[in-house]
Each structure stands twice: as structure tokens, then as C-alpha cells.
Swiss-Prot record:
GO terms for cellular component: chloride channel complex; GABA-A receptor complex; postsynaptic membrane; synapse. It comes from Caenorhabditis elegans. SUPFAM superfamilies: Neurotransmitter-gated ion-channel transmembrane pore, Nicotinic receptor ligand binding domain-like. Residues 25-264 are extracellular. One of its GO terms (molecular function) is chloride channel activity. One of its GO terms (biological process) is chloride transmembrane transport. It comes from the Eukaryota. The chain crosses the membrane at residues 265-285, 292-311, 324-344, 528-548. This is Gamma-aminobutyric acid receptor subunit beta. Glycans are attached at residues 26, 32-33, 45, 53, 193. It is found in: Postsynaptic cell membrane; Cell membrane. Residues 1-24 form the signal peptide.
Amino acid sequence: MRRSKTRRIFHVSITLLLVSTIFCQNGTKPHNNSTSDQMSSSWSNRSQTMYSNASSLLSDLLLDYDIRLRPGFGGDALLLTMDIIIASFDSISEVDMDYTLTMYLHQYWTDERLRWSNEIPIDEMTLSGEFSQNIWVPDTFLANDKHSYLHEVTERNKMLRINVDGKVAYGMRLTSTLSCSMNLRNFPLDSQNCTVEIESYGYTTSEVLMKWNYPLAVHGVEQADVPQFTITGFHTEDSIVSTATGSYQRLSLVFQLRRSVGYFIFQTYLPCVLIVMLSWVSFWINHEATSARVALGITTVLTMTTISTGVRQSLPRISYVKSIDIYLVMCFVFVFAALLEYAAVNYSYWGRERGKGGGGNEWPVNGANKEDRESAVNVQKWVPSGLMDGVPQPQDRRVEALEEAMSTSNTAAQNNNFESTSKPKKRSSSPIPPLCRAGNTISEESESPDYPRYSTTSLKGARPHASLNHKTHHLKGRSSARAKRRMTLARMNVSMKQSISGIGRRARKVIPTIRVRDVNLIDKYSRVVFPVCFIVFNLFYWSYYMMVPS
């Protein structure tokens, strides 16, 4: 009985415990909901309080704030520290002497007017960039800037952060094109130093002191990739710049850049080498193939000129000589020398052939004016053609024969006039009837080496014609004067040719004549000399410019 009673009591107690537990759980749910509502309500009230506190705090901070005055006005100089984060190197231009850089610029200073009490539960406030218009900010600028702009996607990339102790952090993201004075004497095997120069525009060193935020003054340089360059290092500098308005603090970030020559090897150097080697092909072409060798030489020369023009257009117009100019000029010299080599071969070959054939060119007698040219025609009418052929020749024998012929002609004319008074003349009135024909053509008898014989027979009983004799005398006198002037010109040409011949003989005595028996030897030697000289030039060129300090 006792056991059964004890079991009943145990079961009843267990049942009551379970029922009480269930009721307790059901009773706590409404209590938890009310607690969460109370917490959310408290957070909302607290947030509203903080918003109101922050708004009132900013209003209180700006209540008596004068943005025209720097922090610590009238006291010690304001310490302004800054750091830079490099986002990217966009481009570098040798023509414009500048480079484009995207960076984050952060500036830090302390403004006592922006402090607030520690009792306010706000330790730091991050504000938009527009708030910077309500407080004093440094008048920082980039001294070597050409063109800069702030990014505005999706909002204006400016940031302002204020701490409880009055410390201000002011940051912005900008892209700037900065000038970079380059020394291109070793281009494209050169190294350059490009800088970012930061300076205060209006505040002197007595009002604002600028310092780098060491040890983390510059970030992101190792991850930056520069087109056609390799960043070998960087360092920061600070200096004081004195101008007419005072002394200003300047912070400089110097990038040490070395140009990558791979682009120029494939763009300039390798084509030049191939063109020079192409010019050597003419040494294996027969020297009688004039059109082929000349066309090849001219093509290589024009190609080198085109490459040189393209390189000059990608560089600024500077007065000093660059290393790439030396290489292009030497390649042009090698190509042009290959063309001159064929000129030497051609001259040697055809000069020898002409020497074997003999003969030479005769010098023409140049008339001084129109009157002299007319006198030459008149002389040909009255002087035998064999003698006239000798006038333009440089030999003294023919000139003397011409003079003797003219004197004989004058004597014959006088005899003919004397005989005409007693004997009748023939039909022809010319004093030299056997030598002339109709149409002013010279008789073939004039080619005889003997002097001409004039006829003295005339018709008996015929009366002389005075008018004809008068015209004949006048014509012969004028022709004789012109013939003498013509002979004077012939003597001048003879003396000129003799003088030039004498100079040539003296020059040949002084300068030894190089005679090549086989013109193919010039091509054979050129096949070796040209490549060897070009290889030696390249060894000296690359050894010097790869080792010389830029």
C-alpha cells in the first residue's frame, strides 16, 4: 500500500511540474515581446538623440567659426602633414615632357575650434566633401601641375573626418598631368626622374609647415605599372622655396624610372638592322644589272629616311643629339655607302671599257651672242668646209689653217676685182664659185686638204659691173671681221682646254691613280668589309649606352 501511494504522489508531482513548466513558457512569451519593443524603442530614442546631438554639435562648432582664419592664427605655425596613395600611372609623353598620375591625397592638421566635450557620446564624425566649404582647409596645390581634375563618379571624391580632439583628415582623389623635365641624350636607353611637388600657395613657412606623414608617406608604388617604364625606386624630399612673396614649404615625391627598350628594339632597331643587311644583297648581284642594284639601293635609302622621320615625330624638337639619332644616322651611312659602292664599281667598269675603245669628246665652240652665231653661218658660206671643221677643234694647226685660208680668200677677191675690168665675168658673181651651191650648201670640193683655187677667166669685151663689185667688197669685209672674231673665240677655247688639261696632268701626278683590274674584287671585298664594320659599330654602341650612367 505504501509503495502504491508513493508512486501516485510521484506521478502527481511530475504532472504538476510539467504543467507548471508549460504555463511558465506560455507566460514568458508576452514578456519577451515587450522587452524587444522596449529595446528597439530605446535604440530609436538613442539614435534620435545622437542625430540631434551631432546636428547641434556641428551647429555649435560652426557658430563662431571664421573660415578666413587659419587654426592657431597669431601663434605658432600650423603643422600640416600629408601622405599619398598611388592609384595608377596613366601615361608618359616625351613630346610634351609630362606624365599623368591618379592618386589619393590626404592632409592632416589640428583645428582647436573643432574640438568638443568628451561628455558628448561622439568620438569621430565623417562628413561629405561639401562640408569643407564651411571650415578652413589648406590652400595646397601641385607646383608642377599642367592639368588636374577631381573625380565625380558617383559623387565628388572628397572626404572630411573630424575627431573629438579637433584633428582633421581631409582627402581627395584626383588625376593630374604633371610636367617632367627629361634628359633624352641616351634615349631610348635612358632613365628619368619625375616628381610630384606639393606646396602651399599663400601661407609661408611662418604660418604653415608641411611635412610628410612618416613612416607611411607613400603607398601603392610597388603595385603601379608604368607604360614603357620600370619604377626602380622612389623617395621623398622637403625643401623651402624662396620667391618674391616669401619662403614656402615644398614637399616632393621623386619617382626613378628606367625606360623599357623592348618596344624600340622591335619598332626601330630591328627594322634598321634588316634594312642595312638588305642593302648588302646588291654585292651579290652582277655589276651589269644596273637597274636591279640601283633600285635596291634607292629603296633602302628611302626606307631608312621614312624610319628616321617617324622617330623624329615621336620626340620633341631638341637641339642635342640622342643615342637613337646616332644609330639611325650610322645605318643611313651604311645603306648609302652600299649605293656608292655600286657607283664605284660601275665607274671602274665603264671607264676601263672606254679607255680600251679610245677617242674622246670634242669641245664645242660656244658663241657669245646672236651676232657671233650669225657670223659662224657667214664664215661657212665663204670658207671651205674642211677649214671650218677645224675651227671648233682645240688643235693649233687647224686654227692657223683657217687664218691662212682667210688671208688667201681676201687676196683672191682683190685679184678678181682687178681682172674684172679687162675680162668678162662668168654668170656667177660669187668670188668662190667652185665652193658654193644653191641653197647655201658647201661643195664636196671643200673637203680637199688643198687650199681652194679661184677662177680668173671672164668674158672678153664685157664691161665690169661697179655695183656688184661694191657689194662684194662690203660683204667680204664684214664676213672677214666676223671670221676674225670667230677665230678669237676658237683661240680662247683652245687655251682653256689646254689649261684644264694641264691641271688634270698635274693632279694625276700628285694623286695616285687607283686602277682595279677586276671590278668584281670591289664587290668581294664589300661582302666582308660592310658586315664587319656594322658589327663593330653595334658592339661599341650597345656597350657604351648600356653601361654609361643616364
